[in-house]
């Protein structure tokens, strides 16, 4: 299927250039009901490509509003380098995380209403296309239910014929009903989808993608049942007695993937940090960690993640956006399994002087080294040079207001070429992001070619571990977690509990757009984020008169990042339903607090 690797195909054929002025996107479908569309395989492929492209998967291009306001910037993973944008608000904003995907659902339902009569396809092909469309629809309902709780369940393309519009004004289903629909759909289509794909069909759904969606969705449902509260007569929240069944369903779906033998943790590189880095860059079919991937290439759909996240001295224009916090860096253990706190002071509390500042990160979890650009680490043939200031021989500290400020009659800048400063674009924490970034060249706007693994095998193992530990099967949870730790290159655990499983998920899946949803489904976001002052790691050059700068040492200080603490209001566990959805359908009840 040509160009499905970028999920767009021949969009001009099925552009659906119509606007919604009705209840649940009941737009005209004359074009899509045209027999010429369903008698042309190219047109069907184009339509299918559009459904994939519209599917909400929160990939590298998913951000809030504009200019790289990524989900991680609203969590404990990172802060935003820029001083503008809603990601900086002390009060985490409402409504910006929403996705009311009924136009996308309608497009799928229209496809499903017609595909089984498509003359251009064999009966066997029709079943596969039907299953793919239902997979896309289940993904979209998952995107909505994790945001809003229960939403109206629409499985046919609604058509307004000029009669009573009330027949189209469907109320919200209960939250558990949407999760059950996703589970039932995934189970129904699994046998209809092929076990594997190759060639130009590589990026289309397989039965294991359906298992992975079922696994993730059931994990979320179980979490809501156990840790959330039921309100609005079940429109939000899930009865607690349903939790065990959902944990078991998540575990069973994971087992189907694990026991298939078709997937494995990526181990192509000998160096553990390099291996973790290239896990996200190796697009070959030999990368068996990929279960379902969305592809990007500059010929059809280039990415912007590199452009917005390049360190200061490596950027083209925008850059620097995602700054991992020192708190988050400390979450990565050392290779021997010891606590990950950075060793900036000796046992007496005095600053340690480092001749090589990268030694501060010696023996850290290789996943940290593969995910985060830290002070003075190598990058794109140079180094990421981060310095907050200079300590004079008399012990006083000099800091800069700009990157060009020089130290007392020398040519040495007070801050290094990549920061840190309290203003401008440079890092506010001492760190930049490395995961997903192109290591060998600077990438311009919409020229990124890093693919997005919607589902990868390590997530399945972590889902499995979480379900097992919640069901009391710590032996299996420990086994799954230690497979991941072994690949990472850190010491195995000898026992496991719920918090340790969550910790493993936090560091393994960092910056992959899981953390925001995880802390919401566990209902701990307010505990983690409210009044939390995130920290920065600031390197200082210890000045010695008469020495070359390259011979001087560094100390590090863990200091407050120049960002306000945040507040996560309890109502944010569910999103505000868009006002236009309610104004056109009085049967839709708004979520509490809005």
Label every PLM stretch briefly.
Residues 1-18:
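Sec-dependent bacterial lipoprotein signal peptides
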Residues 19-20, 101-104, 181, 272-336, ...:
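Long, intrinsically disordered, low-complexity segments
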Residues 20-63, 358-360, 582-594:
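Membrane-proximal, proline-rich intrinsically disordered regions
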Residues 40-59, 77-148, 166-202, 356-357, ...:
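Conserved, well-structured interaction surfaces
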Residues 61-77, 154-159, 193-212, 225-323, ...:
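Short, surface-exposed recognition loops and adjoining beta-strand edges that mediate ligand/DNA contacts
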Residues 145-146, 152, 217-229, 472-473:
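Short coil/turn linking the two alpha-helices of tandem helical-hairpin repeats
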């Amino acid at each position: 299927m040509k160009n499905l690797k970028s999920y767009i195909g021949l969009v001009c054929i099925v552009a659906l250039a119509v606007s919604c002025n009705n209840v649940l996107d009941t737009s005209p479908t004359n074009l899509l009901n045209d027999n010429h569309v369903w008698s042309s395989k190219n047109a069907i492929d184009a339509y299918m490509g559009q459904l994939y492209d519209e599917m909400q998967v929160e990939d590298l291009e998913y951000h809030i509003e504009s200019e790289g306001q990524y989900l991680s910037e609203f969590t404990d993973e990172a802060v935003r380098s820029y001083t503008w944008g809603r990601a900086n608000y002390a009060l985490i904003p409402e409504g910006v995380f929403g996705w009311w995907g009924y136009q996308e659902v309608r497009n799928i339902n229209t496809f499903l209403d017609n595909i089984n009569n498509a003359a251009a396809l064999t009966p066997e092909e029709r079943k596969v296309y039907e299953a793919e469309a239902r997979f896309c629809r289940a993904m979209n309902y998952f995107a909505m239910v994790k945001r809003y709780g229960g939403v109206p369940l629409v499985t046919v393309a609604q058509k307004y014929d000029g009669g009573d519009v009330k027949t189209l004004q469907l109320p919200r289903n209960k939250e558990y009903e949407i999760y059950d629909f996703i589970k039932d759909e995934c189970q129904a289509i699994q046998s209809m989808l092929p076990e594997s794909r190759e060639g130009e069909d590589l990026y289309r759904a397989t039965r294991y993608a359906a298992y992975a969606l079922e696994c993730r969705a059931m994990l979320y449902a179980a979490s809501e049942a156990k840790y959330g509260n039921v309100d609005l007569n079940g429109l939000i929240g899930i009865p607690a007695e349903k939790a065990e069944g959902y944990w078991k369903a998540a575990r069973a779906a994971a087992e189907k993937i694990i026991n298939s033998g078709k997937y494995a943790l990526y181990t192509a590189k000998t160096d553990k940090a390099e291996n973790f880095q290239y896990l996200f860059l190796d697009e070959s079919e030999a990368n068996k960690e990929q279960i379902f991937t969305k592809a990007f290439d500059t010929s059809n759909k280039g990415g912007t993640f590199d452009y917005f996240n390049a360190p200061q001295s490596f950027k083209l224009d925008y850059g620097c956006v995602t700054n991992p916090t020192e708190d988050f860096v400390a979450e990565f253990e050392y290779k021997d399994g010891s606590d990950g706190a950075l060793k900036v002071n000796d046992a007496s509390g005095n600053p340690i002087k480092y001749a090589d500042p990268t030694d501060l990160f010696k023996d850290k979890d290789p996943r940290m080294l593969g995910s985060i650009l830290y002070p003075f680490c190598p990058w794109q043939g140079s180094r990421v040079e981060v310095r907050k200031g200079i300590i004079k021989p008399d012990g006083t500290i000099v800091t800069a207001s700009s990157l060009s400020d020089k130290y007392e009659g020398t040519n040495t800048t007070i801050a290094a070429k990549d920061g840190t400063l309290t203003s401008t674009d440079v890092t506010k924490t001492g760190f930049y992001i490395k995961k997903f970034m192109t290591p060998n060249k600077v990438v311009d706007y919409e020229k990124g070619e890093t693919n997005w693994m919607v589902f990868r095998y390590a997530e399945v193992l972590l889902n499995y571990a979480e379900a097992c530990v919640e069901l009391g099967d710590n032996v299996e949870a420990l086994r799954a977690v230690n497979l991941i730790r072994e690949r990472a290159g850190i010491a195995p655990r000898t026992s496991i509990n719920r918090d340790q499983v969550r910790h493993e998920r936090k560091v393994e899946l960092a910056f992959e757009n899981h953390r925001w949803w995880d802390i919401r489904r566990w209902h701990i976001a307010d505990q983690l984020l409210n009044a939390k002052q995130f920290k920065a790691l600031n390197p200082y050059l210890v000045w010695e008169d008469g020495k070359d700068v390259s011979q001087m040492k560094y100390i590090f200080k863990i200091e407050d990042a120049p960002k306000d603490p945040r507040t996560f209001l309890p109502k944010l566990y569910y999103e505000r339903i868009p006002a236009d959805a309610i104004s056109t359908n009085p049967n839709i009840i708004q979520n509490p607090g809005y």
